[in-house]
C-alpha cells in the first residue's frame, strides 16, 4: 500500500503551500482559493489514512503495541515542538509583524499575546498531531467498536451494496456526523473551554472522529475499500452544486433557519463535497503511484520532518525575504520552494543521520549499535 503512504506524505507536505500564505500575510485570491479547496479534503483524507494504518498495524502487532508505538512517534515530536520550536516561531512571527522584540514581553504574558499570534494559537499546526494522538490512545475503543454486532451488521449491509450506493451512504453519514460533532462541541464544551487554541483541539477531536473510524472500516472491509477507490462523476458534480448553492446563499439560509442550523448545513455541504474529493485522490494515487521508487520513498520518509518544521522555517524565511521586499505576494511565492528545500535538507543532513534527532523530530526508536 505504498501509494497510501505517498498520498499521506502529499497531504502533509502541501501544508507548506497553505501556511505560506498565513505566515506571509498575503490576501491574494489565488492562495486563498487553494487554501479553501484544500480544507475540503486534506485533514479528513489524512485521518482516514491514519485510521487505516492504525488498524493495519493493530492487526499485525496488537492494539496495545501499536498504541505505544504511536505515542512515541506522535508524542515526542509534539512535546519538542510545543515546548521549544513553537514558542520560538511565535516570538519571531510577533516580533516581525508587531515589532515587539523583547523576549520577556512574551515570556511573562501567558496566556495572552504569546498564545495567540495572528490567528494561530500556541499549538500552531501541531494541533493535528495532538488530535491523532488522542485517537491513538483511544484506539482500543475504536477497534472495540468494530467488534460489536450492530456495527458489524452495518458493515455486512454495506458489503451487499453496489459501489455507488456505498459512496452515498458513507458521504451522508460522515458529513452528518461531522455536523453533529460541531453541534455537540457547541452545546457541551463551548462554554467550558471558551474560544481559543485548546477549544479548537477539542472541536477537531470531536468532528474528525468519524473519519478515523471510517479509516478502520476502510481497512476491514474490502468492499468499502473498493468503493472509495472508485469515482462517481454524477455524485461528485451533485456534491459540488450543493456546496456552491450553500456557499452562495449562506446569508439567506442563516436568516431563514437561524445561525446554528445554517452552520450545520454549511459544514455538511463542505464535508459532503470533500468526501468525493478524497475518493478521487484514492483513485488517482492507486493508479499512478504504481511503484515505490527512490524519489517517492524519500519524499514519503521526509514528509514528517517537512510537516513539523515548515512553519518555523517559513517564518524565518519570510523574515529574511521581507528585508528585500514588502510585497507579500512575492514573499509568499518565493518562500514556498525555499521552505521545501530547507526542510528536505534538514531531514537529509541533520535529522536522519542522528538517532537522537530522529527520535525527537520523527518519533523513531533509538537504534542500537
Give each language-model segment a name.
Residues 1-369:
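Alpha-helical transmembrane segments and their immediate juxtamembrane cytosolic regions
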Amino acid at each position: 500500500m505504498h501509494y497510501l503512504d505517498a498520498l499521506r506524505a502529499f497531504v502533509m507536505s502541501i501544508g507548506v503551500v497553505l501556511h505560506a500564505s498565513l505566515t506571509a500575510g498575503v490576501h491574494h485570491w489565488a492562495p486563498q482559493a487553494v487554501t479553501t479547496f484544500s480544507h475540503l479534503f486534506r485533514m479528513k483524507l489524512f485521518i482516514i489514512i491514519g485510521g487505516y494504518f492504525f488498524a493495519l498495524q493493530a492487526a499485525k502487532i496488537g492494539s496495545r503495541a501499536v498504541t505505544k508505538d504511536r505515542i512515541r512517534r506522535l508524542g515526542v515530536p509534539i512535546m519538542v515542538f510545543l515546548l521549544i520550536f513553537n514558542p520560538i516561531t511565535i516570538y519571531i512571527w510577533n516580533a516581525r509583524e508587531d515589532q515587539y522584540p523583547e523576549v520577556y514581553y512574551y515570556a511573562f504574558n501567558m496566556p495572552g499575546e504569546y498564545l495567540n499570534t495572528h490567528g494561530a494559537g500556541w499549538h500552531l499546526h501541531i494541533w493535528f498531531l495532538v488530535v491523532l494522538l488522542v485517537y491513538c490512545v483511544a484506539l482500543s475503543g475504536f477497534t472495540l467498536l468494530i467488534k460489536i454486532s450492530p456495527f458489524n451488521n452495518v458493515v455486512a449491509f454495506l458489503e451487499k451494496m453496489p459501489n455507488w450506493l456505498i459512496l452515498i451512504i458513507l458521504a451522508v453519514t460522515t458529513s452528518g456526523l461531522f455536523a453533529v460533532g460541531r453541534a455537540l462541541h457547541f452545546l457541551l464544551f463551548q462554554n467550558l473551554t471558551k474560544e481559543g487554541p485548546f477549544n479548537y483541539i477539542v472541536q477537531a477531536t470531536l468532528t474528525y472522529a468519524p473519519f478515523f473510524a471510517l479509516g478502520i472500516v476502510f481497512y476491514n472491509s474490502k468492499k468499502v475499500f473498493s468503493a472509495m477507490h472508485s469515482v462517481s462523476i454524477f455524485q461528485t458534480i451533485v456534491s459540488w452544486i450543493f456546496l456552491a448553492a450553500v456557499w452562495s446563499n449562506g446569508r439567506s439560509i442563516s436568516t431563514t433557519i437561524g445561525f446554528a442550523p445554517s452552520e450545520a448545513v454549511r459544514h455538511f455541504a463542505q464535508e459532503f463535497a470533500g468526501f468525493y474529493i478524497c475518493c478521487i485522490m484514492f483513485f488517482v494515487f492507486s493508479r499512478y503511484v504504481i511503484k515505490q521508487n527512490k524519489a517517492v520513498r524519500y519524499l514519503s520518509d521526509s514528509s514528517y520532518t517537512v510537516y513539523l518544521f515548515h512553519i518555523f522555517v517559513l517564518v524565518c524565511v519570510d523574515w529574511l525575504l521581507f528585508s528585500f521586499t514588502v510585497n507579500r505576494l512575492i514573499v509568499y511565492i518565493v518562500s514556498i520552494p525555499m521552505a521545501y528545500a530547507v526542510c528536505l535538507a534538514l531531514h537529509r543532513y541533520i535529522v536522519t543521520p542522528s538517532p537522537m534527532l530522529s527520535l525527537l523530530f520523527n518519533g523513531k526508536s533509538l537504534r542500537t549499535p
